[in-house]
């Protein structure tokens, strides 16, 4: 199987989907690997480093001729022209956010594997490290944009406690998963007060136990509680993600209007559509805008801003799946590996993820029925 590692075109995206070390694992297993020129530069990997591990450096167009194209984020619209029948595209594709790309993949007969929907032992195994990074960075960005020169309230989120008692900021975090706890931990490290809004009762108990000795309040998620707590936020971070599907707009414009002027609002799951009515995707180079008096931060690829860290994390997670596909062929790998099967969102043009199908009102096919 010919495997290609392509350079990301998304603005500000410095990650690469495969490290030189992982290229060596593929070539040692007898697979041919081509790497687009400068694909790894943003993560600190030169073309020579890939060549030394057995890869061939190629152009953008040549890379897209491969049987298996390994990416970080969804293909750019300029890359749709390279799609070909039965080609496999791997990455954090977040297809629920764009019907256009789904329809193009269906038209051509592409197979799309989305790392964020791979579930192993009940957990989003590949997404978790990226969620952790996004959560931590969101807390930092909240502090940064709280400063007056960025349009924020002009507050220091840590407060001041040398001979005075100026309280720190309040972070309200919507959701209680991996991204949420990582955001909370950074906020606590900054001496901020944290409120977590969570729906699941078991998770609420877990969070209460986890933060029993910390300045954290855990609140049951209801529309009424959300509306009440958001008013307290100096920084509001939404972490809600529904695997494979576009989430509902749970944070309404009226709720945003009720927030403090100059407060900061961040939606980590904006790459899947987001849960905030007033949010829209932004970029790492132009990350914020003001609406209803609130600073909105809508960067969909936050880990791309710290590529040296995040590339190592994602590459460690995806290589075993990629090797299995290459060694066995996709169909046998899907049959043998239930977790991998959950990542197949589109198989040869047929939608095989129920959340994705419902998001775009498309027909859904069970993956194991399709490949039999």
Curated annotation (Swiss-Prot):
The keyword Membrane does not apply. The active site is at residue 94. GO terms for molecular function: alanine dehydrogenase activity. It catalyses: L-alanine + NAD(+) + H2O = pyruvate + NH4(+) + NADH + H(+). It is an enzyme of class 1 (oxidoreductase). GO terms for biological process: alanine catabolic process; L-alanine catabolic process. Its EC number is 1.4.1.1. Keywords: NAD, Oxidoreductase. The keyword NAD applies. NAD(+) binds at residues 170-200. Pathway: Amino-acid degradation; L-alanine degradation via dehydrogenase pathway; NH(3) and pyruvate from L-alanine: step 1/1. SMART domains: AlaDh_PNT_C, AlaDh_PNT_N. Belongs to the AlaDH/PNT family. May play a role in cell wall synthesis as L-alanine is an important constituent of the peptidoglycan layer. This is Alanine dehydrogenase 1. It comes from Staphylococcus aureus (strain NCTC 8325 / PS 47).
